[in-house]
Amino acid sequence: RHWEPTLRAEAPDETGQPETVLALATDIAVVDHVSGSVWLIANAVNVDDKSTRADAAYNEAVARLDQMQRDAATPAPDESRVNILDETVAQPELRFRTEKSHYEQAVERAKQYIVDGDVFQVVISQRLDIDSPADPFDVYRVLRTLNPSPYMYFMALTDAQGRDFNVIGSSPETLIKVDNGHAMTFPIAGSRPRGATPEEDEKFAKELLADPKECSEHIMLVDLSRNDLSKVCVPQSVEVVQLMDIKRFSHIMHICSTVTGKVDPSLTAFDVFKSAFPAGTLSGAPKPRAVEIIDELEPADRGIYGGTVGYFDFSGNMDMAIAIRTAFLRDHEASVQAGAGI
């Protein structure tokens, strides 16, 4: 709604999640999980933008880098392991924000909007809340084990009121990426569970690619990605370089495609982000009307669900994950959300 002036957000905010959290990362440890290598980075940020401060900013960065090296060489305290199969721990109960009958009513209303020609597709979701007495970082460690994904994140943050919270996720999907002047998006739509055997796995993959509904939905979202990139890329540079391949994850497989384009030199990564947000795979098509329908049919604001977790760097690059399979934790309560494309 910040760049679509006709859109209004009327669904109530029930969880108090901040709309945006931005951080300037000055000191960074980059871990290559394949090679086991670690790079320590201390950015010399001259916030005053004065030449007289440049040398001081550099010297401060060098001092911080030296301290990071000393900290990295210090053995970490011995922490107890997390037993993810501990059956002595009482299993907390999920609390569904939306009753089944109310969700079904929302789906039927969404289908009518499609029949009426308002949208081709819309994603209707609901929130689940659960008590979470565990240490948030233990939650992340378990998630890495049970559901590894291309984007894994653990964020310890503070909102404007000074309240601490965590965002923990394992997203499989990129919203948008910019690398050296090239924009990339990787629409994911269509899914099946992983098979118990290689033969069953292959059977499910063939069924998925033969499903007309799944394929139709996927092609529509590929076209939406092409349209998003065409707004910010050099004319005729947008192309589908990979169409409808099966990508397998620990518990699920998806149909995935890749759309790329050369970013207009007069634009920045922020412009590219604006063209793609929110994700069509989490809202629908056309996006503005789909967002209006979601705001009408869902009983509460989505919070981080369907938003993004990622970074902009000093070189003009960007990598943004769609915030799905993501939990918001505060005061020993976790909220997660899931949706279905109609």
Task: Identify the meaning behind each predicted range.
Residues 1-342:
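Extended alpha-helical targeting/anchoring segments
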